[in-house]
Structures are given as structure tokens and as C-alpha cells.
């Protein structure tokens, strides 16, 4: 596994969906992460970038969909998602647009 020096190379983007917005109310945030990163690296990156306390990290490797084109079949790239749960006394992450009500 290659070493990743900058924590911003681990977190690629927030996942914006109905399910991820529903989890925000429970203190769980969803991110697209680098496929080679592990749970410890993800935890350290979130704590450094956002200044919060992470209690748990769950990861999921997602297969890219097979899509049909006029020249045959292609495939979207595989992605890795991380569901990061913050501690109860931690401040919310504002990258998702604030509170959902």
C-alpha cells in the first residue's frame, strides 16, 4: 500500500443523497474516500481537517455499474465510501450545508 501524506488526499468528496442526509441527524457523515485508505487513516483525516472527534468508521467498497454504450459495454469506476460517526459532544460538519430540518 502506498503512503498518503496529506489527509486531504484521503477524503475525496462528500456523498450527497437522501440516505446520507438522513444519517446526518444521527451524527454520521458519508464521504467518498481513496480506495487504498484504511479506517485509521480516514479517522485521522476527518479529525485533522474538520477538528471533530470520531467514534467509529465503517467502509464499503462499491462496484462500478456496467453501462451500455453504442460501441458495446463500459464500466463506471469502483468507489469506496466511508460512514464516519462523530461523538455526541462534537460539533457538526458544515460541509453538508448545515442542519437539515
Curated annotation (Swiss-Prot):
Keywords: Ribonucleoprotein, Ribosomal protein, RNA-binding, rRNA-binding. GO terms for cellular component: ribonucleoprotein complex; ribosome. The keyword RNA-binding applies. One of its GO terms (biological process) is translation. Signal peptide: none annotated. InterPro entries: Nucleotide-bd_a/b_plait_sf, Ribosomal_uL23-like, Ribosomal_uL23/eL15/eS24_sf. SUPFAM superfamilies: Ribosomal proteins S24e, L23 and L15e. The keyword RNA-binding applies. GO terms for molecular function: rRNA binding; structural constituent of ribosome. Part of the 50S ribosomal subunit. Contacts protein L29, and trigger factor when it is bound to the ribosome. One of the early assembly proteins it binds 23S rRNA. One of the proteins that surrounds the polypeptide exit tunnel on the outside of the ribosome. Forms the main docking site for trigger factor binding to the ribosome. Belongs to the universal ribosomal protein uL23 family. This is Large ribosomal subunit protein uL23. It comes from Rhodococcus opacus (strain B4).
